[in-house]
């Protein structure tokens, strides 16, 4: 059996739409100053998880990564890390998409919550690892102890963003899926 690997116009439009929403959601933020750099509470992670849940791993990861990277390119503070953001937020969408597509094709709120949780955990590990090695030790020249302080200072915002995404993305996914199905615009 041959697998259809063509990307449709509808899929391209959905990737672009969700990437734009991720970019805007990332911009809706409250910056928090820290000892080294800043952290932020924002809505981008909800939309990264939503991208993976609705579009699946590869297209959802692309939408999450592109939208987040575009936001970083628009902010001089983050532009130098946009390539890392593309990879890390892309992984967020990929992991959420892999979990939602694992097993039965049909999914519900519970499976969407597990997908958002796994995506959030994967992203948190990648983000805190980047904070320790890249931002802390490489870019700021911190000692190991200083890099750990930087990681610990990022934990509250990272945890808050993850919890909001774990709660919000499945609710949005179920509502959007139902509305799209009812209007015969199903994305499954």
Stretches with model-predicted labels:
Residues 1-188:
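Loop-helix junctions at membrane interfaces
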């Amino acid at each position: 059996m041959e697998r259809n690997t063509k990307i449709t116009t509808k899929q391209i439009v959905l990737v672009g739409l969700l990437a734009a929403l991720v970019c805007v959601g990332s911009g809706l933020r409250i910056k928090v100053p820290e000892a080294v750099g800043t952290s932020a509470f924002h809505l981008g992670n909800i939309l990264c998880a939503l991208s993976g849940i609705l579009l699946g791993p590869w297209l959802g990861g692309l939408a999450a990564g592109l939208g987040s990277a575009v936001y970083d390119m628009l902010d001089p503070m983050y532009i130098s890390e946009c390539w890392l953001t593309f990879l890390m937020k892309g992984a967020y969408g990929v992991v959420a998409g892999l979990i939602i597509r694992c097993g039965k094709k049909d999914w519900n709120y519970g499976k969407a919550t597990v997908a958002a949780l796994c995506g959030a955990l994967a992203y948190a590990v990648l983000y805190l690892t980047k904070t320790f090695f890249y931002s802390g030790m490489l870019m700021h020249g911190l000692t190991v102890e200083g890099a750990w302080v930087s990681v610990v200072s990022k934990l509250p915002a990272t945890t808050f963003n993850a919890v909001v995404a774990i709660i919000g993305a499945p609710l949005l996914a179920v509502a959007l899926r139902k509305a799209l199905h009812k209007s015969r615009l199903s994305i499954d």
